[in-house]
Amino acid sequence: MGSRNSSSAGSGSGDPSEGLTRRGAGLRRSEEEEEEDEDVDLAQVLAYLLRRGQVRLVQGGGAANLQFIQALLDSEEENDRAWDGRLGDRYNPPVDATPDTRELECNEIKTQVELATGQLGLRRAAQKHSFPRMLHQRERGLCHRGSFSLGEQSRVISHFLPNDLGFTDSYSQKAFCGIYSKDGQIFMSACQDQTIRLYDCRYGRFRKFKSIKARDVGWSVLDVAFTPDGSHFLYSSWSDYIHICNIYGEGDTHTALDLRPDERRFAVFSIAVSSDGREVLGGANDGCLYVFDREQNRRTLQIESHEDDVNAVAFADISSQILFSGGDDAICKVWDRRTMREDDPKPVGALAGHQDGITFIDSKGDARYLISNSKDQTIKLWDIRRFSSREGMEASRQAATQQNWDYRWQQVPKKAWRKLKLPGDSSLMTYRGHGVLHTLIRCRFSPIHSTGQQFIYSGCSTGKVVVYDLLSGHIVKKLTNHKACVRDVSWHPFEEKIVSSSWDGNLRLWQYRQAEYFQDDMPESEECASAPAPVPRSSTPFSSPQ
């Protein structure tokens, strides 16, 4: 099957995995705003516009100017040195000291999380200081069946969040994607060097066992996903195709899934696989949702879903009947797979409240709740039973249209720091404290088995991993070591380990490590005392059920 690789692979100085979405209304800027925002090299901006076909060169200016512009084009497309994701290091995202929890307090998700973490019915003081009391009750046999319940285990594990760097792997170019498999046995990393690396994570290991050269890649691999049975993986790029490849076996068999787009320059920014592995969902730069049926081996749907790039797609739960999409129009839409039609592309509802484009969506897995990351520097928590009104959708669209800065190469304007809720915002909660610059930064719910999904965690343009408490909105952990933006983050489904993938070319595994040993913890015998101190284990009191 032939491939048509997009020549626009380098489009975008920060992350070309998006189309240029600066609207005419956003071109007008006041003198005060121009002084506040960081200056941008006009020659580099012009080079970007030329590459996107939005500006043409006419006669005049001399050959020297043409050569200069071409040199910029070559440096950005081939060497990718113009924007390396380090701009965000100078940006200190404002933290919301008093998150508004009024909507969340009245919603069932509060009860769900408290039940899943053993906090339901406990007073606030008991929730914070109940660890020794829990151990004492277990020793007295007062726990259910003599051991901690799943909720109590999750509450204990919250005391052992990853806090230390356990493993690092370095690449020659930017790391774009990194996710654990559903069972936690494999970690997959995708890099701008067009290589997909697989790591064996069984029995506490993190060892690379396979490297696969991706095919038909323009600029970089943009998204990856595992098949439900864990035997294959999929990846997308600036290409007409989504590719699927085997994980096990001696050879690498790449199968191209042709989406047959109408656009000449085409990219799939986000992919998801149905629970039965039959359908592959993709969101693309032409504003469309694509559905590819693997059994029929053809594209079955092309839905005009958003007014701009579709940056994020996700299935709501294991049924794969409800799905979510988010785009640069700042709207998150909810679709029913059973009623999706190309001739009548109507979602069942929409969620509005963001003021700029959505970069990622993660479902809680219960077909009710989801979170979205946005260029407005916030994460929002949604309940799909609370769709937005027309007023809310119009307010969100208007706010996105009036944005007059580009998050790929500019600093966040000070006016975007304001804590402002749009009319008709139907979100349950808004989380502030991380930066979203340069690229489509991801955020996710923490695992249900080990944490009861009591946390939300996100990458950050300042090179951090930021962990929020879902119910309070406060930041409970920041993991700092990267020198450029962290684009992707993934929490092990059963262990207290987080892997961050950064544009500094590094993959970092974070785990819990005890800060110091106390005298009571040390052995008393002389024979044991002469031995070296044991290395703290990375696992928490509850091991993986693998």
Swiss-Prot record:
SMART domains xref list: WD40
Cysteines joined through disulfide linkages: none
Top-level taxon in the UniProt lineage: Eukaryota
Keyword Disulfide bond attached: no
Phosphoserine modified-residue sites: 75
Keyword Manganese: no
Entry-linked InterPro entries: DCAF, DCAF11/LEC14B, G-protein_beta_WD-40_rep, WD40/YVTN_repeat-like_dom_sf, WD40_repeat_dom_sf, WD40_rpt
Listed GO CC annotations: Cul4-RING E3 ubiquitin ligase complex; nucleoplasm
Any matching Pfam family: WD40
Residue ranges with Polar residues bias: 537-546
GO BP terms, alphabetized: exploration behavior; gene expression; memory; proteasome-mediated ubiquitin-dependent protein catabolic process; protein stabilization; protein ubiquitination; respiratory system process; response to oxidative stress
Mapped WD repeat ranges: 170-210, 216-258, 263-302, 305-345, 353-392, 435-480, 481-520
Pathway assigned in UniProt: Protein modification; protein ubiquitination
Keywords tagged on the record: Phosphoprotein, Repeat, Ubl conjugation pathway, WD repeat
Subunit structure: Interacts with DDB1 and CUL4A.
Record-linked PANTHER family: DDB1- AND CUL4-ASSOCIATED FACTOR 11
The protein's name: DDB1- and CUL4-associated factor 11
Organism: Pongo abelii (Sumatran orangutan)
